[in-house]
């Protein structure tokens, strides 16, 4: 779809669209972010003998809707910001991209793995709590003299929240004792995570 060239690169971008590739952003928000849709000779024609599945992923103009979220800047550089299926849409219409918050949290010392999601509560009046579930590097934290892992990460996340807009702030930190379940590509399987908060 796109690539950075040896002498033509932009930090954070996956590059300019390759020759003969058309890229558009479907239903962009106020920041220009939306679903990345592509059209070109390298795009599949559809799913074999499955017109319904094909119709689900192609729009009326023949663009393939990738399921990736991103934006194009004024010069046509493409940025990927997350996955559509991971997107958290709050009741006020604001979009929260978990991958953006996960990237910030992953830079905290002692974080081995992290997943951010919208917590599910049966009792809380505010059901829009953003949860950061962390699998820590327990050995590293132990060598750093951290006795209370929960308190350590609660403090780190509070500090991070001070730099975040209010609707993106993490409201709960969950610590897990084992790695997240992964698929054969070593990617975390998000749907297997218990998102309950009470």
Positions of the model-derived regions?
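AMP-binding/adenylate-forming catalytic core of the ANL superfamily
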Residues: 40, 45-46, 69-164
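A short, local hydrophobic-aromatic micro-motif
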Residues: 19, 34, 45, 112, ...
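Conserved AMP-binding/adenylate-forming
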Residues: 1-78, 84-87
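Short glycine-biased active-site loop of nucleotidyltransferases that positions the nucleotide triphosphate
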Residues: 12, 123-126, 185
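Conserved C-terminal "lid"/linker of ANL adenylate-forming enzymes
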Residues: 113-118, 158-198
